[in-house]
Amino acid sequence: MPLTDEQLEHYHREGYLVATDVIPERYIHDLQEEISSVIDEQARKLYAEGEITELHEELGFLHRAAELSKESRNVIGPVNGGSLTRCAMFNLLTCPEILDIMEQFVGPEIIASGIYRIRPKLPDKPEGIVPWHQDSGYFDTCADEHLVPTCWVPLMNATIEAGCMEVLPHSHKQGVFRHYKANLHAPPLAVHPDHLPDTEPVPVPADIGDVVLMTNMTPHRSTDNPSGLIRWAVDLRYNAPEAGDYGPGEAGFLARSTKTPAQVFTDWREFDRLRKEHVPQSKADRVWLKYDEETFLDPSKRADKPFPKLR
């Protein structure tokens, strides 16, 4: 179901929106099963190689990878980030209910960005704590004048305790803030504290079927996960062709089109082949300084220092 006028107004005013009951349950279930299958394949491989000593077959989707990862972080490698290129991942990327909303944002010509990510946020692990950043901080500058919506899709009920997303509302119309490369286990890019908007953070818990919608300029972060569960989520990005190749390291594809419908990807095997055969032509052209090269008015506010949790 498309967004209402009120929802669209909230998104454009605040820079985010939690749209409830968007994704049919089968898309989430199928992706959970696909991830579980890949985790099982990897666990058996590592077990045969002697890298892990237990398979933990009795555990389910929200627990098994966490237990396996206590012996080897290589367990989640085949599903982490943009690694997964199988059928259920493709089906979620091309979910009609998501594309209907994206058409409201970017028009009828829709590129599914190559920068999609599966996020297995393990409990009580520092690499799951992601600092304040804007997606455009990672992008090539060609996208700076374009809307690149993010769809953050929980694969479990993402509560505050499990480390749901947090946003800085109505801070998305000031362009790309200065970022730096923080000294973190997590993806290190962080908004420079001297440039961080003085805005009260808002946690955005979401349930299965919901989508947290953000702009590419919306500052957001993720805190720790003491829930004991893996906070599984996927973030997807879409854009009009005019936004350009802002993530040249990874291949996106045409997900919907009225102009060239024959070029729309309809088979996951096309998607899988595209991802595996893609040869990056260049890197994003935006450059940020490392934490030990930057200057800070108040070093205690660096993102690689402990920050307060919204509880």
Locate each region found by the language model.
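Non-heme Fe(II)-dependent double-stranded beta-helix
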Residues: M1-E14, T20-W132
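A short beta-loop-beta micro-motif enriched in histidine and acidic residues
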Residues: V106, G137-V148, T199-E200, A206, ...
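Short, conserved beta-strand element in jelly-roll/cupin
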Residues: D140-I160, P205-A206, L213, R237-A240
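Active-site region of the double-stranded beta-helix
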Residues: P108-I111, S136, T141-D144, P154-C164, ...
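Double-stranded beta-helix
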Residues: E9, A158-R221
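Non-heme Fe(II)/2-oxoglutarate
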Residues: E41, V211, T218-R311
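Short, surface-exposed loop/helix-turn segments at secondary-structure junctions
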Residues: E58-L62, V130-D135, H185-D198, I230, ...
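Short edge-strand/loop segments of extracellular domains
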Residues: K121, L168-G175, R231, R237-E242
